[in-house]
Amino acid sequence: VMWTVSLCVSLGVLGAARLEAACTKVEPGWLWNYDGAIAEKYRIRMTLVFGTDEIKGVYFYGSQLRDLRLKGRIEQGSRLLLDELDAAGKVTGRIDARFVTRDPKGRYGDSELACEVIVGTWSKPDGTGAMTIYLSMEGGTAGSLTRRYGAIGVKDDEVVHRGAQRFWRAVSSDERATVAASLRYPIRVMLGGKVVRLAGPDDLLARYDAIFTPAYREAIGKALPRNMFVRDQGAMLGSGEVWFGADGRVTALSNF
């Protein structure tokens, strides 16, 4: 009973005074990333492709970094219905949500929204185990679900993901040699207000603490090293703290 009351309260907070938006996006050649959480504690990132008649996508939990497939549709311009599928195509979960005109978390202020914020529930296929879901759009890039990083010449997205996750985990666990080996040299960093060129791993290790400050390590740790934004200069971790090349190695450190 207490769990049911808690869910209802959470849904009320997320949905109070939020009018349904009209999301009419049809862009089959674009990937739209959303960040958010299930039950306000399980961090997720979702990528959606808005086709003419259906929605396809993937999402993953920040704690697992493993894609779960999605397939569904938009009804009446605002209701988003998605099936979560396993590798065999069996439905393992369902998302019933709405695009809303106002962000219940206030990220967009008083702006009237269309496809930017999704609010609803995730549940098991039989409708049990319902939990709230909230997602906010982070950005979009040209590509497909099977070739996200084509803009930088990548044929296998997992090459970038493996490199990004190796670097990300190494920074979090202070494995300095692995961090140093994850970079493409020469590379430039900001030290003491000046741009410094690092010729190889030894240069980075000698200046490691000055480069990877506590604040910089924290920003990297909060970012999600999968299904990242991409442009011609590389795949972007977080808000641009780190950039990766087609080989999965770090090409830029924005440590300023």
Question: What are the roles of these predicted feature ranges?
Answer:
Residues 22-114, 118-134, 148:
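Central antiparallel beta-sheet cores of small beta-barrel/beta-sandwich binding domains
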Residues 126-144, 234-256:
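Short beta-strand edge/turn micro-motifs at domain boundaries
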Residues 15-21:
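Boundary at the C-terminal end of the N-terminal hydrophobic targeting segment
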